[in-house]
Regions:
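Substrate-binding cleft of carbohydrate-active enzyme catalytic domains
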Residues: 6-25, 76
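Aromatic-lined carbohydrate-recognition surfaces of secreted/lumenal glycan-active proteins
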Residues: 19-27, 88-91, 110-149, 164-167, ...
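Active-site-adjacent "subsite" loops/lids of carbohydrate-active enzymes
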Residues: 25-77
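Active-site groove signature of glycoside hydrolases
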Residues: 60-101
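Glycine-rich tight-turn/loop motif centered on a GG-T
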Residues: 100-114
């Protein structure tokens, strides 16, 4: 079993800042542990999966569920207690596939983008300056509107952004600079570009 506190301590001993990563709403273990936090399957008693069960489909936490937002916040708190002052959140989003079979419960007409904004606001208010929260999104989710977010990532009010560049879309230094500038103009305070094909992560 990995001890997060020991991992954080080792990084600090080496003069490095320990940073943890969470999968946020793409958490099948959490979804199965408490079904009230998960996206349901319309008209059925079981959970919605992001693929066929035979193809290893996974359930997701429901961004509209207060319990799911609280649960993710509690995970962040556990990491902070273990010594991680920065946490990268991936999958602060809705599943890429959309279907009438997805049951999000009562949404009160709140859009996907507004719900994600509200979820982020809960975490930011809870942790304030105690934990630096980063939000990690694909280049496509940053550059344009997607079904997963409802708006480009910066319009969610993200202050600390990690942009994941797919290998097929590796960027030149000029393109990366333009991307960072565009996000700054959209209100993002800190941008990290992860372009593995170019060996770039800063």
């Amino acid at each position: 079993t990995v001890d997060p506190a020991r991992v954080a301590a080792i990084f600090r001993e080496e003069g490095l800042i320990p940073v943890a990563k969470l999968a946020a709403f793409r958490d099948p273990a959490g979804a199965r542990a408490d079904r009230t936090m998960a996206i349901g399957y319309t008209g059925q008693a079981y959970l919605w999966l992001d693929n066929k069960a035979s193809a290893d489909g996974k359930p997701w936490l429901n961004p509209y569920a207060d319990a799911a937002v609280q649960y993710i916040g509690d995970l962040i708190d556990e990491l902070h207690t273990a010594g991680f002052e920065q946490v990268v959140l991936e999958n602060v989003q809705f599943p890429a596939s959309t279907s009438s079979k997805q049951d999000y419960g009562t949404t009160n007409g709140v859009s996907r983008a507004d719900q994600l904004r509200a979820d982020m606001a809960v975490w930011e208010q809870r942790f304030g300056n105690g934990v630096t929260l980063w939000y990690s999104y694909t280049l496509a989710e940053v550059a344009d509107t997607s079904s997963t977010l409802g708006v480009p990532a910066a319009q969610l009010g993200v202050k600390n952004l990690v942009v994941r560049v797919p290998s097929a879309s590796t960027m030149t230094a000029e393109e990366r600079a333009a991307l960072v500038q565009a996000q700054a103009e959209a209100g993002v305070e800190h941008v990290v570009v992860r372009d593995n094909a170019a060996g770039y992560y800063e």
